[in-house]
Amino acid sequence: GLQQLFEYGYFHADPHPGNMFALKGGSRKYGHLAYVDFGMMDTITDSDRFTLIKAIVHLINKEYLLMAKDFQKLGFLTKEQDLDLLVEPLKDVLGGAFGSEVGNFNLKNVTDKFSKLMYSYPFRVPSRFALIIRAVVSQEGLALRLDPQFKILKIAYPYIAKKLLTDNSDEIVDILLEVVFDNQGRIQIDKLESLLSTLFKDTENINSDLIPVA
């Protein structure tokens, strides 16, 4: 799912268990997934892809004002919105989602909290993101059924870290420079170390016995 969104910009928008098969072989340790039923497919623009990557990095670094700017660019907030007013609400919703560590993040719980937040603050869901949210939440739900200890950011952030450190495209390099250097051009060693440690940490903690073969 991450590759579909962040690499190809073309994704399966209805990834329920009947539309995915776990197959042996391939380049992956635990085999690979085969998708069927392509009646509900969608695309994501390059601009949205890169902004989502930035939003994930800002989420990990708990930079809520920058994340509010990402939401604004993606269309979840109007251009007239005072973003400073949203820092604390975002911190309450997203900061509490982590618990003691990044891996405690649960997208379904955060989505539910955001739904309540929309009654008090001018968040809106652009129509082009409806299928993206559906697809990601569906896949997280399936993963949680297979492994109740599954944590989506333990999969997503290492993927993003690897992309930032190995992708030579101008857009990704710009994001990396924004992460590693502050506004005065000084290198932020802690953030660079975080990216590197995440990249080299072994995150393959999925039990192969839990992968169904249909």
Please report, for each region that a protein language model flagged, where it lies by residue.
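Conserved catalytic cores of large enzyme domains
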Residues: 1-214
